[in-house]
């Protein structure tokens, strides 16, 4: 039986979140064993925030949740790809559909931002 290897990165694994229909990579976040199990049990994506040092469910503040369609691991069992149905317009906390909207062009990084919501309105803190 394959067991996910959480030890290589100090208890965390990268989780690549991909739109199930388009194949677009929406975001990359980190999971520990607890958040992977929460994801598998609930059918929603859960992560561990290294910045805030806490667990969080995608969309718990914005409403832009993710329904899990399929979960895969790589040949080393130290990374997962989670194919999701994205609920709401955007996966990124900046309001963009994907967190990957900055592109390397002609020797520099260029932002191709097209926010679908205003983060200042959605994340009222």
Swiss-Prot record:
The keyword Transmembrane does not apply. Binds 1 Mg(2+) ion per subunit. It is found in: Cytoplasm. It holds the Pfam family PRA-CH. Mg(2+) binds at residues 74, 76, 78. Its main location: cytoplasm. Keywords: Amino-acid biosynthesis, Cytoplasm, Histidine biosynthesis, Hydrolase, Magnesium, Metal-binding, Zinc. GO terms for molecular function: magnesium ion binding; phosphoribosyl-AMP cyclohydrolase activity; zinc ion binding. Its EC number is 3.5.4.19. Zn(2+) binds at residues 75, 92, 99. The keyword Hydrolase applies. It comes from the Bacteria. Its cofactor is Mg(2+); Zn(2+). One of its GO terms (cellular component) is cytoplasm. Pathway: Amino-acid biosynthesis; L-histidine biosynthesis; L-histidine from 5-phospho-alpha-D-ribose 1-diphosphate: step 3/9. It catalyses: 1-(5-phospho-beta-D-ribosyl)-5'-AMP + H2O = 1-(5-phospho-beta-D-ribosyl)-5-[(5-phospho-beta-D-ribosylamino)methylideneamino]imidazole-4-carboxamide. PANTHER family: HISTIDINE BIOSYNTHESIS BIFUNCTIONAL PROTEIN, HISTIDINE BIOSYNTHESIS BIFUNCTIONAL PROTEIN HIS7. Catalyzes the hydrolysis of the adenine ring of phosphoribosyl-AMP. Homodimer. Belongs to the PRA-CH family. This is Phosphoribosyl-AMP cyclohydrolase. The gene is hisI.
């Amino acid at each position: 039986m394959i067991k996910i290897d959480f030890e290589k990165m100090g208890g965390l694994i990268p989780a690549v979140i991909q739109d199930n229909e388009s194949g677009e990579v929406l975001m990359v976040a980190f999971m520990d064993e607890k958040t992977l199990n929460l994801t598998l049990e609930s059918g929603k994506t859960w992560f561990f925030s290294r910045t805030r040092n806490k667990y969080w469910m995608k969309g718990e503040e914005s409403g832009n949740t993710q329904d899990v369609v399929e979960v895969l691991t790589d040949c080393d069992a130290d990374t997962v790809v989670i194919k999701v149905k994205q609920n709401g317009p955007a996966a990124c906390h900046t309001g963009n559909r994907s967190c990957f909207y900055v592109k390397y062009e002609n020797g520099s990084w260029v932002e191709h931002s097209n926010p679908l919501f205003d983060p200042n309105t959605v994340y009222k803190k």
